């Protein structure tokens, strides 16, 4: 490797045609705004909870393409989705409203922008009280859009 040359894992994935697949183990998405974990309930409601033992906060992230992910609750089987009004909800089937652009920020938190509404910069976000935040009310720089992927087990 030449001096100053940088290789990333995504570049290697593309170069060698490796499958994107899923991120193997379920994760918890911890929101720095209010200390909530993103939760997708069986009835399709999306919110946050501080209860680390809640089974609906275990999320499986699977890559559709480089930087594009589906987020699915392992307990409810619902996919995180954002409708045309920017409301977060759980969907039974993966579709275009369920794809999110995942970005690692400089502060080591991740942000998730709805791919369908990427031109509007609508992020996944949680309010301090744990309610989901409407896409049009989110913007870059808010704590509400920052999520830290954590392992399910605390050990």
UniProtKB/Swiss-Prot annotation:
GO terms for molecular function: fibroblast growth factor receptor binding; growth factor activity; heparin binding; integrin binding; S100 protein binding. Residues 127-143 are annotated as: Heparin-binding. The gene is FGF1. Keywords: Angiogenesis, Cytoplasm, Developmental protein, Differentiation, Growth factor, Heparin-binding, Mitogen, Nucleus, Secreted. Residues 1-15 form a propeptide. The keyword Secreted applies. This is Fibroblast growth factor 1. It holds the Pfam family FGF. SMART domains: FGF (SM00442). One of its GO terms (biological process) is fibroblast growth factor receptor signaling pathway. Its main location: secreted. It comes from the Eukaryota. Plays an important role in the regulation of cell survival, cell division, angiogenesis, cell differentiation and cell migration. Functions as a potent mitogen in vitro. Acts as a ligand for FGFR1 and integrins. Binds to FGFR1 in the presence of heparin leading to FGFR1 dimerization and activation via sequential autophosphorylation on tyrosine residues which act as docking sites for interacting proteins, leading to the activation of several signaling cascades. Binds to integrins. Belongs to the heparin-binding growth factors family. It is found in: Secreted; Cytoplasm; Cytoplasm, Cell cortex; Cytoplasm, Cytosol. Heparin binds at residue 33. GO terms for cellular component: cell cortex; cytoplasm; cytosol; extracellular region; extracellular space; nucleus.
């Amino acid at each position: 490797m030449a001096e100053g040359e940088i290789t990333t894992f995504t570049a290697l994935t593309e170069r060698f045609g490796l499958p994107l697949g899923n991120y193997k183990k379920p994760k918890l998405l911890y929101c720095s705004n209010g200390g909530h974990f993103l939760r997708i309930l069986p009835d399709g409601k999306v919110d946050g909870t501080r209860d680390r033992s809640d089974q609906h906060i275990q999320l499986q992230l699977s890559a559709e393409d480089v930087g594009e992910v589906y987020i699915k609750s392992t307990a409810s089987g619902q996919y995180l989705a954002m409708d045309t009004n920017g409301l977060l909800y759980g969907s039974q089937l993966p579709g275009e409203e369920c794809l999110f652009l995942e970005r690692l920020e400089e502060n080591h938190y991740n942000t998730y922008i709805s791919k369908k509404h990427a031109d509007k910069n609508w992020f996944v976000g949680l309010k301090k009280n744990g309610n989901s935040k409407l896409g049009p009310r989110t913007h870059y720089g808010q704590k509400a859009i920052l999520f830290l992927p954590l392992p399910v087990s605390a050990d």
